């Protein structure tokens, strides 16, 4: 199942609710479909130019595989287990939202031919229960996530998190990038712009360097970003994030940003 089929299955046929207002979900689907069509037209146009050039030059096609292999995308659902991360006023936990998004993203990317590794698939922190972990759970958890990335060839690391801020008016996706690999900036920029284009037209945030403030991005050498998917301090955005349909839209958007970067 490719991303277009996934989108069609998860978009209802009706376009209006009882009050006659266009449903946000359908607006997202229409916008997303239009974007995919435009992207396919662009690819077809570029392929046509390349094919004409090849024919004119008399070149023979020997190998049609990509010149460089697609990366293995590591989806890192932040927090887990005893570490709930941020929480909303009504008790929505960051760790649960992170995992929910990562699982949907895995299915979308896998359906589109991308190899995916999850740092966690359940509600747990990553530490060895057979050793003395007293007071070291978070450190061991970070080390385990780092090890997964470092042991993966041609990795691309995308960490999924939620945001919080004292002012409840703050909303929107915010992407941070590692400075250790120049491809991180392009990945972050593409995910951020895709979110703004397809889901959050009012979001005027720009990508940010992680510096030394984000442990994993500071340590990783592969392309690596951290996506703050929304503010649990915002009642309005919390309501959206708690809705499964919105999370599917958000997961699709993030995957589209990844796919635009690597394909």
Predicted features, each with a name:
Residues 2-263:
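Catalytic-site microenvironment of enzymes
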